[in-house]
Each structure stands twice: as structure tokens, then as C-alpha cells.
Amino acid sequence: MARKNSRDEEKMNYPAELRRLKEEGPQRLYLLWGPEDYLREQYLAQLKKRCLPEGEDSFSYKRLDGPELDRQELVGAIDAVPFMTERSFVEIRDVELNRLKEPEKYMAVFSDIPEYCTVCLVQSAQFEPDGRLKLIKTLRSVARELKFTQQSQGMLIDWIIRRFAAAGKSVELEAAQRLMFISGDLMSRLIPEIEKIAAFAKGERVTA
């Protein structure tokens, strides 16, 4: 059977995930990964806003940075009761989940997160979970796993048009398609190119 390439894989329905977050509210555990890091950060911001409507503070927000993850520090962050807000939020960045020592200890922690806490594992665009590992299997059974993929061409075209409009420019369809052909289909790569084109375009309309 032929292996699917990145363009053939199922695309994440980002608007649907935002609606789900709004309707269901924050879950206890999230695993965010995938190549589309711009959308990942946008989703993280929305999730954090739902958990901490008044913003980050030292009582209800904790951030742990990888590649190592100290179990006691993790437990302490999760067990800290939120202050002046309903939920606490623990952001864990770029931990080597595929290489954690004594993974069973972390499996126990991630499987027993209190109702008032949301833990979010945020992985780099290069991360790929090893589905053979017990820790990854456990995470997938208890976490809301979101893989942020490149978006469909139609969605990207609409997004490019909106980005140019925000900069006071309109853009021809052919110009938007050419931009994607040259810069690729990752939003983080398209944004600086859109900004440069909008800044140097002489007229109000960007053409191919």
C-alpha cells in the first residue's frame, strides 16, 4: 500500500476544533503537535484564555520547559490550587516525550489530573509521537490530541486574503496561489512574506 505524503494526509479542521473548545470547555489534558506551528500557538492562546480569562498569574499558571521533565515539579504544578479563577493551567513545552526515563511514573500523573487543572503538552513542529511507546499510548487514551497540519488550499487562500485585507491591501487569486507555490503552505512562512509584499506594494491591489 502506498504511503501517504504530507499533502495527502487528513487536514485538521481548525474552525471545528475552536467550536468544540467553545462548546465543551477546556479538558484536563492536551497534546498539541504537528507542522503548522502558527495554528498551534493560536489554539494554545484560545485554550489559555478559556482557562485563565483574567490572564496569567503566578498562582494559576505554570510553565515547564523541556527537554527534561522533573516529575516532582510537574506534580507540584498540577496540585497547586487555582487562586481567584476556576481553573489552573500548566503549559509544558518541548519535552522529549519519546525518551522520558521511567515513563510509567508520568503515565500515572497524566492519568490523574484534577478537575480544576488543564495540562497542555506543546510540542515543536518537528516532533512526531512514537505510537509504540506506553507513554504515548496512555497520553492518547486520556488526552485531547490535536495534530496541527497544513490547511487546505481553499482555507489558505481565504486566510491569505484576510491577512492582506488587514494590511489594507486586496490580492488577486493568482497572486495568492503564486505566493503559496513559492513560500509553501505553512502559515508561519507565509506571514512574513505577506507583510513584506503588503509593505512594498505600490497600489492597493496585489497582483501576480
Where are the language model's segments positioned?
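Conserved beta/loop motifs at nucleotide-recognition and modification sites
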Residues: 1-208
